[in-house]
């Protein structure tokens, strides 16, 4: 099983989806421009309602800026980065279609194509700020995909991340 993650702290903390890591005992982590494969043996923190988890590797990393905004804007251009079907760091683009409330979680609906393995990847604005964490896509719909909004990421991982306003 493969998935994606986002570095949120320079001490090696990585944000991903709980459904990516919840059945694992160890997690192999790759970084761009680094041939070494790192292993994480522990889920540091998780939230089952938000489908978020944090793991840690022993590597200094440059974190991605987390953008906290009032609301993502419909029609706003976005970029999705993940590892669909194991294809490392694949980039696709699209727009924000809507912001949806699903019980306890507010999700961003977006059109950038994703596939299995994209979960845990970054949904970025055009300035490289994290708008959300890619979480789901519907096979029956075309480019009908969801990401956990950055405001929930901030609440969940507040003591791990650097916030950009």
Question: What is each residue range found by the language model?
Answer:
Residues 11, 44-47, 58, 97-100, ...:
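A generic structural motif
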Residues 2, 9-82, 86-89, 104-107, ...:
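Conserved active-site neighborhood of the chymotrypsin/trypsin-like protease fold
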Residues 62-63, 84, 130-165:
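C-terminal cap/linker of serine protease catalytic domains
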Residues 86-94, 141-142:
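Short, Lys/Arg- and Gly-enriched loop/turn segments at beta-strand edges
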Residues 2-4, 40, 93, 111, ...:
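Conserved beta-strand residues within beta-sheet cores
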Residues 91-103, 146-149:
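Short, compositionally biased
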Residues 6-7, 96, 113-134:
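Catalytic nucleophile loop of clan PA
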């Amino acid at each position: 099983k493969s998935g994606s993650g986002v570095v949120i702290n320079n001490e090696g903390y990585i944000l991903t989806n709980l459904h990516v890591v919840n059945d694992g005992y160890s997690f192999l982590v790759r970084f761009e421009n680094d041939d070494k494969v790192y292993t994480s043996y522990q889920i540091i923190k998780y939230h089952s309602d938000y489908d978020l988890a944090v793991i840690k590797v022993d590597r200094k990393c440059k974190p991605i800026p987390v953008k906290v905004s009032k609301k993502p804007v419909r029609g706003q251009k976005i970029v999705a980065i993940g590892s669909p079907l194991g294809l490392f760091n694949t980039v696709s683009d699209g727009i924000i279609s809507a912001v949806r409330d699903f019980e306890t979680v507010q999700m961003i609906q977006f059109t950038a194509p994703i596939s299995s393995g994209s979960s845990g990847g970054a949904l970025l604005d055009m300035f490289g700020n994290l708008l959300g964490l890619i979480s789901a896509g519907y096979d029956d719909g075309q480019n009908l995909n969801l990401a956990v909004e950055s405001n929930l990421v901030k609440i969940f991982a507040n003591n791990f991340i650097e916030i950009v306003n």
